[in-house]
Regions:
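Residue-level marker of intrinsically disordered, low-complexity segments enriched
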Residues: 1, 74, 89-91, 109, ...
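N-terminal cysteine/histidine-rich coordination modules
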Residues: 1-44
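Residues in well-ordered beta-strands of folded domains
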Residues: 22, 77, 119
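Generic structural motif
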Residues: 26, 79-83, 123-125
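Primary mode marks residue(s) on the alpha4-beta5-alpha5 output face of response regulator receiver
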Residues: 47-50
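Predominantly extracellular/secreted and cell-surface proteins with exposed
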Residues: 52-56, 60
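Short flanking/linker segments adjacent to small metal-binding domains or redox-active Cys/His motifs
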Residues: 59-104
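Glycine-rich, aromatic-bearing surface loops/beta-hairpins
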Residues: 96-129
Length: 129
C-alpha cells in the first residue's frame, strides 16, 4: 500500500465528484458519524470514508428509518500485498474482486466494506425518485 499516494488521491476528490443520487449523498452525510472506528481505520490507510469509489444500492427499512448499504468500495494506491482483511464491529473489510475500472494512473486495488446500517435522511432526501 502507498498511504501517501492514497491520501493525495482522496485530497483531489470533492463531494460534487461523487454520485449525486440521494442514496449516495445520504451515505456521505451519515457514514463517518455512524461508523467512527471504521472511518479512523480507513484514514490510517489514507482513505476518506466520505469519498467512496463505488456504492452498491442499499436496501431501505421503512419501519426503522435506516438503509443497509451492502458494499461500499474504496480505492487504495499501491500493491495489495501488505493489506490484511479485517473486521471492525459488524463491518467486514477486504479486497474486492468485482468493481468498475478506476480512472487512476498507477498501481492500486479496491476494497469492499459493509454492511453499513445508515440512517435515512428523509428530512433532506426523497428516496422515491
Amino acid at each position: 500500500m502507498d498511504i501517501e499516494r492514497t491520501k493525495l488521491y482522496y485530497a483531489g476528490i470533492k463531494r460534487e465528484d461523487i454520485c449525486g443520487c440521494n442514496y449516495c449523498q445520504n451515505l456521505i452525510d451519515e457514514i463517518k458519524q455512524a461508523y467512527p472506528e471504521v472511518a479512523a481505520y480507513l484514514l490510517s490507510l489514507g482513505v476518506n470514508i466520505e469519498r467512496p469509489f463505488e456504492v452498491f444500492f442499499p436496501m431501505e427499512d421503512h419501519d426503522n428509518g435506516y438503509m443497509d448499504y451492502p458494499v461500499v468500495q474504496y480505492l487504495i494506491a499501491g500493491n495489495s500485498s501488505d493489506f490484511h482483511e479485517t473486521k471492525i464491529g459488524d463491518i467486514q473489510i477486504g479486497i474486492s474482486d468485482c468493481h468498475p475500472n478506476a480512472a487512476y494512473e498507477g498501481e492500486h486495488f479496491i476494497i469492499d466494506a459493509g454492511v453499513f446500517h445508515i440512517k435515512c435522511r428523509y428530512d433532506k432526501y426523497d428516496f422515491n425518485e
